[in-house]
UniProtKB/Swiss-Prot annotation:
Top-level taxon of origin: Archaea
Biological process (GO), any one: DNA recombination
Gene Ontology molecular-function annotations: DNA binding
Natural source organism: Archaeoglobus fulgidus (strain ATCC 49558 / DSM 4304 / JCM 9628 / NBRC 100126 / VC-16)
Name of this chain's protein: Probable transposase for insertion sequence element ISA1214
Physiological role: Involved in the transposition of the insertion sequence ISA1214.
Coiled-coil portions: none
Record bears the keyword DNA-binding: yes
Keywords per UniProt: DNA recombination, DNA-binding, Transposable element, Transposition
Family, per entry: Belongs to the transposase 11 family.
Length: 322
């Protein structure tokens, strides 16, 4: 599309006023009755994933070749270590609590382990590889559309601070994650972790997509990522749905593509842009189910803990399109 006229800062501000009016219409539409019958039907898919989880784990570890090491072999085989790790992360309890729970579930797991053994799972390289393979298996099973939304959030390292209630949301008491969600399936397709910033986590999540060979057809991002630098991370074939800032002065070719898309179909642009709410809803559900606190002290173990949250999210993912 060629606009046929020069795009100025004034034009952008007027265009944003129009988008504000359309946004209110869309918010009213979103209040329509939720299709609970369809949601209940899709919950059966989740139950099937849970039933097949041991099978998925076996497939995930089948492609891992472990070289024999000097010293004592591990007392627990890889399949049981992966299942134990997933169980520990799902429970969202301290390692000592998990140790006590395993006394109850010993007939199920067939093992007795100490809280120290559980903690070491968070830095077990073989478990990490198995989880990565499991992540990919779940995506292959469900399919990847190429149409995504992305957002970041923070997790607290101390029980006295919460990311949502801390106005600065920075510093040594928080760690940042960025997850990219498939708007068709509700599954996470990319994950990034950082002890520095949300944008650093964002770039790592994009790197994960690239490493898996996942093509990004479209993506919606919030205003925090409304910059030319962000737009240049995507190629010309990717439709980026982000709202320009009101003080945008230098338009340039990168922003022109976004503005052309808005002018061509403002309602459709906003409907797609608001799909980013899926990311916020996903974070909220994850923190309710798996907690908002990171108990691990080592950086690699913190990253592993938060990757596992995304993995469990995909197991429980239910996407009902209205």
């Amino acid at each position: 599309m060629n606009l046929g006229f020069r795009v100025t800062g004034k034009f952008v501000r007027e265009l944003l006023d129009v988008l504000d009016e359309i946004a209110e219409e869309i918010r009213q539409e979103e209040k329509e009755k939720y299709p609970y019958t369809e949601w209940e039907r899709k919950r059966e898919v989740v139950k099937e994933r849970l039933r097949k989880l041991p099978e998925y784990v076996r497939e995930a570890i089948s492609v891992i070749t472990v070289q024999k090491r000097v010293g004592r072999p591990k007392k627990v085989d890889l399949e049981k270590r992966v299942m134990l790790f997933l169980f520990a992360r799902l429970m969202d309890k301290s390692n000592r609590d998990i140790e006590e729970l395993l006394e109850l579930f010993e007939p199920l797991f067939g093992i007795k382990v100490s809280y120290k053994t559980i903690e070491r799972l968070y830095s077990d390289e073989e478990v990490r590889m198995a989880l990565h393979n499991l992540f990919i298996l779940l995506l292959r099973e469900e399919g990847v559309s190429g149409d995504f939304s992305g957002d970041g959030t923070g997790y607290s390292l101390t029980i006295t601070k919460h990311y949502r209630s801390n106005p600065k949301r920075k510093g040594k008491d928080f760690r940042y994650v960025f997850r990219i969600i498939d708007i068709d399936t509700g599954m996470y397709v990319g994950f990034g972790y950082s002890d520095r910033s949300e944008k650093d986590a964002f770039e790592k999540a994009l790197g994960m997509l690239k490493s898996m060979g996942v093509k990004v057809n479209s993506i919606s991002l919030d205003k925090y990522y409304s910059s030319r630098k962000t737009l240049r991370l995507f190629d010309a074939e990717t439709a980026v749905y982000v709202i320009p800032k009101r003080n945008l002065a230098r338009i340039g070719f990168d922003w022109l593509r976004v503005i052309e898309r808005i002018v061509e179909a403002p309602y459709r642009f906003l409907k797609r842009y608001f799909k980013r709410n899926l990311s916020e809803a996903g974070f909220s559900a994850d923190k309710r189910r798996f907690g908002w606190l990171i108990r691990q002290r080592r950086e690699d173990r913190r990253e592993m803990a938060l990757f596992a949250v995304g993995l469990w999210h995909n197991v429980f993912a239910v996407r009902v399109v209205r």
